[in-house]
């Protein structure tokens, strides 16, 4: 048996208010249409649902049975409609993002602040991952998308879009101030202690290749887990390190560290968005992605 859900919806409100006129008012309809719909419902179900009187209606046993089943469904559907409406207008919702430390520090945090100011009802879940881990999280469907720093290896089915280029600088503690006036070579850096991220990181791979291309070998004396840790170690005079210029800027301006200069040009890196274009995003995630890619181009 097929019965139009609209009839059940009208039945729910008539039974709830025990009055055709009140139900019509709530539904934005008129009493004759409501009465006609309920007559059709009774005809299709082949039973009497209401006892009509001048004061309104009361439910028959069959009506009571139907209402006991319909009420919870009607409330859940109404809640779902309200939630979808709130989601569509960005009053509520959630976004899950995997981000690398560099991407979060020099790009994503500012975008998140602007988005959260405009849409405070959207919940944000940010996961801190390395670039390979972030890409894998997108592939596994664990996050809506990832914001990473290059280099990155992207598998088939995923798309990568450049959001912002950035460059890195070589910095050292104040004991290396005398070197700041020189133009060093990568080979000469072998004479000084170096601080780097772990051997498994894409940043380490990036600099390993950079050194090799100039007939030099990258041999760090100290490994750190994060760029923030590297900066702390640099300030503690443990060695030299390559760090994103935006992350070193404040410390350089305060004179806590010094910038050293290389003869070789450090290749530019990029902050990129990675997403699965086969997987649809919810309204909030789609809106934030549009904000990020307003002036993008492929990496």
Segments and roles (model prediction):
Residues 42-61:
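A short LG(V/I)-centered, amphipathic sequence patch enriched
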Residues 44-45, 66-88:
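Alpha-helical linker/hinge and terminal dimerization helices associated
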């Amino acid at each position: 048996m097929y019965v139009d859900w609209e009839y059940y919806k009208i039945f729910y409100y008539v039974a709830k208010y025990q009055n055709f006129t009140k139900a019509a008012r709530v539904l934005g309809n008129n009493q004759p249409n409501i009465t006609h719909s309920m007559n059709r419902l009774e005809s299709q179900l082949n039973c009497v649902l209401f006892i009509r009187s001048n004061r309104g209606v009361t439910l028959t046993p069959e009506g009571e049975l139907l209402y006991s089943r319909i009420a919870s469904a009607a409330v859940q559907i109404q809640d779902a409609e309200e939630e979808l409406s709130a989601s569509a207008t960005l009053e509520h919702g959630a976004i899950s993002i995997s981000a690398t430390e560099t991407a979060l520090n020099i790009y994503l945090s500012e975008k998140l602040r602007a988005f959260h100011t405009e849409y405070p009802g959207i919940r944000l879940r940010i996961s801190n991952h390395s670039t390979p881990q972030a890409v894998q999280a997108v592939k596994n469907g664990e996050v809506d998308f990832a914001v990473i720093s290059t280099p990155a290896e992207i598998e088939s089915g995923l798309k990568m879009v450049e959001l912002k280029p950035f460059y890195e600088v070589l910095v050292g503690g104040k004991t290396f101030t005398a070197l700041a006036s020189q133009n060093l070579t990568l080979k000469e850096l072998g004479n000084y202690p170096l601080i780097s991220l772990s051997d498994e990181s894409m940043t380490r791979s990036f600099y390993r290749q950079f050194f090799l291309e100039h007939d030099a070998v990258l041999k760090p004396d100290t490994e750190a887990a994060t760029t923030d840790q590297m900066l702390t170690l640099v300030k503690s005079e443990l060695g030299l390190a390559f760090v994103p210029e935006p992350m070193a800027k404040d410390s350089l301006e305060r004179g806590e560290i010094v910038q050293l200069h290389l003869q070789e040009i450090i290749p530019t890196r990029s902050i990129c968005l990675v997403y699965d274009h086969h997987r649809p995003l919810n309204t909030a995630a789609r809106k934030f992605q549009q904000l990020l890619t307003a002036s993008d181009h492929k990496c």
